[in-house]
Structure formats: structure tokens, C-alpha cells
Curated annotation (Swiss-Prot):
UniProt-annotated catalytic positions: 119 (proton donor)
Protein name, entry field: Serine/threonine-protein phosphatase 4 catalytic subunit A
Modified residue annotations for Leucine methyl ester: 311
PANTHER family, A to Z: SERINE/THREONINE-PROTEIN PHOSPHATASE PP2A-RELATED
InterPro entries tied to this protein: Calcineurin-like_PHP_ApaH, Metallo-depent_PP-like, PPA2-like, Ser/Thr-sp_prot-phosphatase
Residues that hold Mn(2+) 2 according to the record: 86, 118, 168, 242
Protein purpose: Protein phosphatase that regulates many processes such as microtubule organization at centrosomes.
Chief localisation class: cytoplasm
Binding site for Mn(2+) 1: 58, 60, 86
Location in or out of the cell: Cytoplasm; Cytoplasm, Cytoskeleton, Microtubule organizing center, Centrosome
GO biological process: angiogenesis; brain development; central nervous system projection neuron axonogenesis; determination of ventral identity; dorsal/ventral pattern formation; double-strand break repair via homologous recombination
Source organism: Danio rerio
Assigned EC number: 3.1.3.16
């Protein structure tokens, strides 16, 4: 099956199917990923995004909460979206979640930007659920392989109107400028260390300088590091995801770093609310807070114990 640009009949049908949380066929996944690859390969490591845009944090396979996000924030293409990674793992519907976002990307490439999170990785998804889910729903690892190949093509960061730097995790001691990010060869599995790893794994910390991350990857970075980076790159703030915040969003370092978290009642048990950030054409900020959607419980697997390790 081949989706030809200009004829979106099949793709529109697949989007409708995925919106109902119904799987598409394996050969359709293959074709969708091939098309997505053509689009993503053209994007920069620091993808330029124009305002107005709505910025979203981690989703983690919580499909019905993604639908709630679209309900409160507007559907694609009416609303322009930027998702900061971690589409998969932990939730029950990583397959449907990622494929819906990918199908929307192929259908409306200029209205949705997807950047890579630390869970968009072969190694991590084999531990935290996506691999097992693909196997359970498709009977083999083939769909997982198609999707993880696409992970390698996802952009590492984005910049809104040249002013707001968006990245999944945070900063790296190896990176002082956006141009240094632009030179990274991103088309690979997330390395265990180095600048690409740091962008996806690091966290802000109320300290100065750099610290050892308890996650075992990336770094903790302090307010002075942020001040230096923002000044050197003439940006007003860093927007990132990666950390659960109970209120859905959290400011750090005098409003120079913002954490946005978009998975309500994370892991179906944390009791947190979620947030998305609306930026208007003047980069004025408005937060939309939302709660978990009523869950569709049919067909849920019995919860497999996974390591309690919060990413």
C-alpha cells in the first residue's frame, strides 16, 4: 500500500481509525513510516517552529488522555502543535498514540512537530512497555522495528520564533550553542552519554553548574548554566518535559526554564493534572490544565509490574 502525496484518502481513513483507538494493518504501518521518514529526514536538529503553537510534554501511551488534550487544545490542523517526546511506554496504548501522532505528521507536516524523548529508544522501549505492546497487538516485533527506525529520524529540539528553545530533557556540558546541536548526527539509537543523550535526559536542579544525574544518564544543570546558554543563543527561555510535575507545569530559575507535563494521572495512579502551553503570535503564554479522561477499560492487559523508575 502506498500513500501518494495529494491523495490522502487512505491516510484520512487510517487517522479516523486511529482516533477510535483501532489498529491499522502492519503493511499500512510500514507505508506510514516510510512516508514519515521522507518528511522527518528534511527537518533540522533544531527545528524552526512558528507561533502560534501549543507545546506539549510527555504522553506515554495514554491514548484517551491524548484525545482529551486535543479536545481542550483543539484538533490538528486547526491548532499547530509541538510535542516534546516520550510518546510511548508505561501507558496501555503506545502503539495507537504514536501511530496517530505520526499519521497526523504525515498528513499535516507543517501543523505538528514531533521531537525525540529519551523513551524514543530501542533499549528503553524494550523495558518499559512499547516492545511488549507491539508484540502483543501485532504478533511480532515488526511494527516495533518500523517505529523505532522512525525514532532515529525525529528532531532533537525545536525553536519557536527563534526565541523559545524546546527540548525533551535539557542542556549538556558539551553544548554551548544551538549551532553545535545542529551538527549532531541524530540518525542513531540514543547513545549512553554525550550531547545527544544529555539533551534527552538532563534535568534542571536548584544549584549552580553541573551535577551528576540520579537517572544514570544526562546531567543536572543549574541556573547559571541556563543564564549563559540563553544569553549566548539570544533566547528568552527553555521549555522542556521529562519530569512529572503534579500541577502540570513548573517554572524554574526565575521563569527561564519551564517544565510541561501532559500525561494526567500518570501511569493511571499518580493523581497529577496535566498541562499544555499555548503560545500566541506575540509569544504570550497561556496554560491549559486538564485532568485524565474517563478510561476505556475493555481490552486492557493485566498490569505487568515494571520497574518504578520515573522518567
Amino acid at each position: 500500500m502506498c500513500v501518494i502525496m495529494g491523495d490522502f484518502t487512505d491516510l484520512d481513513r487510517q487517522i479516523e481509525q486511529l482516533r477510535r483507538c483501532e489498529l491499522i494493518k502492519e503493511n499500512e504501518v510500514k507505508a506510514l513510516c516510510a512516508k514519515a521518514r521522507e518528511i522527518l529526514v528534511e527537518e533540522s536538529n533544531v527545528q524552526s517552529v512558528d507561533s502560534p503553537v501549543t507545546v506539549c510534554g510527555d504522553i506515554h501511551g495514554q491514548f484517551y488522555d491524548l484525545k482529551e488534550l486535543f479536545r481542550v487544545g483543539g484538533e490538528v490542523p486547526e491548532t499547530n502543535y509541538l510535542f516534546m517526546g516520550d510518546f510511548v511506554d508505561r501507558g496501555f496504548y503506545s502503539v495507537e498514540t504514536f501511530l496517530l501522532l505520526l499519521a497526523l505528521k504525515v498528513r499535516y507536516p507543517d501543523r505538528i512537530t514531533l521531537i525525540r524523548g529519551n523513551h524514543e529508544s530501542r533499549q528503553i522501549t524494550q523495558v518499559y512497555g512499547f516492545f511488549d505492546e507491539c508484540h502483543r497487538k501485532y504478533g511480532s516485533a515488526t511494527v516495533w522495528r518500523y517505529c523505532t527506525e522512525i525514532f532515529d529520524y525525529l528532531s532533537l529540539s525545536a525553536i519557536v520564533d527563534g526565541k523559545i528553545f524546546c527540548v525533551h530533557g535539557g542542556l549538556s556540558p558539551s553544548i554551548q550553542t544551538l549551532d553545535q546541536i545542529r551538527t549532531i548526527d541524530r540518525k542513531q539509537e540514543v547513545p549512553h552519554d554525550g550531547p545527544m543523550c544529555d539533551l534527552l535526559w538532563s534535568d534542571p536542579e536548584d544549584t549552580t553548574g553541573w551535577g551528576v544525574s540520579p537517572r544514570g544518564a544526562g546531567y543536572l544543570f543549574g541556573s547559571d548554566v541556563v543564564a549563559q546558554f540563553n544569553a549566548a543563543n539570544d533566547i528568552s527561555m527553555i521549555c522542556r518535559a521529562h519530569q512529572l510535575v503534579m500541577e502540570g507545569y513548573k517554572w524554574h530559575f526565575n521563569d527561564t526554564v519551564l517544565t510541561v507535563w501532559s500525561a494526567p494521572n500518570y501511569c493511571y495512579r499518580c493523581g497529577n493534572v496535566a498541562a499544555i502551553l499555548e503560545l500566541d503570535e506575540h509569544l504570550q503564554k497561556e496554560f491549559i490544565i486538564f485532568e485524565a479522561a474517563p478510561q476505556e477499560t475493555r481490552g486492557l492487559p493485566s498490569k505487568k509490574p515494571v520497574a518504578d523508575y520515573f522518567l
